[in-house]
Structure formats: C-alpha cells, structure tokens
Amino acid sequence: TNTPEQDRYLQVKKYLEYVVVDNNMYRNYGNAGPCVMSAEISFEPLQEFSSCDIQEPLSQDIVQPAVCGNYYVEVGGECDCGSPKPCRSACCNAATCKLQREHQCDSGECCEKKDDCDLPEICTGRSAKCSCVISQGDLGYGMVEPGTKCTDGMVCSNEQCVDVQTAAK
C-alpha cells in the first residue's frame, strides 16, 4: 500500500500524463530513459526529458467541452468561482464562467482580508488592485491609521490588530 504522499504523486503523475498524451503514446523512443507515458509506474524522478516527453503537445484542451464550476479557468472561460451556491465572487458569473458586465478581472489582492485592520475592499472588476472602503483615515489599500479600534480591547498598530496595552508601550 502507498503512503498518502505516494498516492498524491501518482495522481499528479497521471494528470501530467494526460497533458502530454499524443497519438504515439506508447511508442519506443530509444534509450533516453523512461517516458512519462510508460506503462510501468516508477517513483524515481526523471533526470531529463526524453524525446517522447517533448514531442508536439496537443493543440487543444484534453477536457472537451470545457467545464464551468470546477474552479479552473479553461479555454473559453474568463473566471471560475465554482458552482453558483459556493461562489462568492461579485465579478464572476458562476453559471457561465464569464465576467459580469463591466468587469475585467475576478481575482487579486483585494479579495483577501488580512485581519480586522484591513478594511473591506471592493472588487471593482477593473483591476486586481484594491479599491478600499474608506471609513477612517486610510494608509493605502484598506489599512487604517494606528490607534483605530479594530475589535474589543484591540487597536491597529503597524497594520495589525494588537492588544491596547501592547500598543501603548
């Protein structure tokens, strides 16, 4: 039986095999070492690419047709935030995997909140950069001024929430 790491390795290896598959997948390409598409499974890493590994790849996606809702932006898609229920993107239409009207992007630093000192940001859809909601003094991209209360007994200091006593030192 395999360890979890070996199982994961085999899953990734199998995926990569599909990426490089072509019409000559099991043809003998000489003594350059094992081919990625070899029928034998090996845990030994390849030292170099053999000629079979660098043949002209497929000119199209392996998955036909593209799948919307798998969190992977495929050919023809512009975004993919999963199926409609778990999708939390205001910029991506989960049903079509196309950007909402007037939007040009769906991801970037403005989508992730670091802590309570990081004000809510708005994905404008025009850039992956933040466009923050300014409710108090702003130091850039959603960061508030030092001393601003962020939770009970906590204030912002150096862009992080710290205990009031710690900030006073």
From Swiss-Prot:
Residues 65-129 form the Disintegrin domain. Its main location: secreted. A motif (D/ECD-tripeptide) lies at residues 116-118. The keyword Signal does not apply. It is found in: Secreted. GO terms for biological process: proteolysis; venom-mediated blood coagulation. GO terms for molecular function: metal ion binding; metalloendopeptidase activity; peptidase activator activity; toxin activity. It comes from the Eukaryota. Inhibited by EDTA, but not by PMSF. Expressed by the venom gland. Its EC number is 3.4.24.-. Residues 14-57 form the Peptidase M12B domain. Its cofactor is Zn(2+). Gene3D superfamilies: Disintegrin domain (4.10.70.10). It is an enzyme of class 3 (hydrolase). Keywords: Blood coagulation cascade activating toxin, Disulfide bond, Hemostasis impairing toxin, Hydrolase, Metal-binding, Metalloprotease, Protease, Prothrombin activator, Secreted, Toxin, Zinc. Binds 1 zinc ion per subunit. Disulfide bonds join C68-C97, C79-C92, C81-C87, C105-C111, C110-C123, C150-C161. Belongs to the venom metalloproteinase (M12B) family. P-III subfamily. P-IIIa sub-subfamily. Monomer. This is Zinc metalloproteinase-disintegrin-like mikarin.
